């Protein structure tokens, strides 16, 4: 089998960054009143700015599809034209239609003269990793001479005030128990829009940094866990999920069915422990230790989890010190499926990488507890 390399990365982040005090100018106010919980949640998640495909009037400036296409076009140059691309793999947690798939909509937006293989991955944060794995396997097996993996989100569409019913904000409980903030309010002040694209080829780029993909492993713990994060559905007292089509149309808004929701009890109970369980399994499978990792790229939904990961990984015997971490969440926000690509893109062009260094990327997905790990070598 061939080696496969990430030879180029590109991004599209819409409009100007939005600071913490500007958010409700874009998203609107629930019940016409400023959120009293916003500052508490932001203090916990550590995000200082994010990007929205919205203007201050709440009007959409870019679609998910348009942003993905713009990021992909950022890969093109004199060495790669649109019609040179063999395969397109797209991941998103926020598709804008049920049918056609997000991927073929991106292909249609790109245009060009040549047909190509296109695949889409639906779900949540791991869909970017899914797209990267599918693209890398096709290049590695010789089915494609190159491939593009994209990950993009327009989650601001789900964060607007019109998607939320009036709900009380239990400020005292939020202060005393930060985990309670990981509900609708937390997610509303965390998520960000944007798109990233990676070019994969069978040999390193002629100049600059390339990253050889050593392996990508993905797993799901849905067989033993309940749904934790969901949208377009409601969860009953027995832990069963009921999709939007099970409800009368008049309840879609009154029950905030299309707001992104999180079961904070399950998140606290499982998200870190299961991720480390899987990491230890992979360290045995691929024969590596924490000492072999020069750069650790963890997709964090919130900086709230940083110290908890450090503490638990030390206790479990796979400790990567913070000075070897690379995280850009505070400046780009949580872009869900694109967050892993965002770290790769920024680190790739940072001037900080040295040949031979090992990069371990971790993407946890709380929806029903899936995890993606990817090991890369700097070339």
Where are these predicted regions, by residue range?
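Short beta-strand segments
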Residues: 7, 91, 122, 147-153, ...
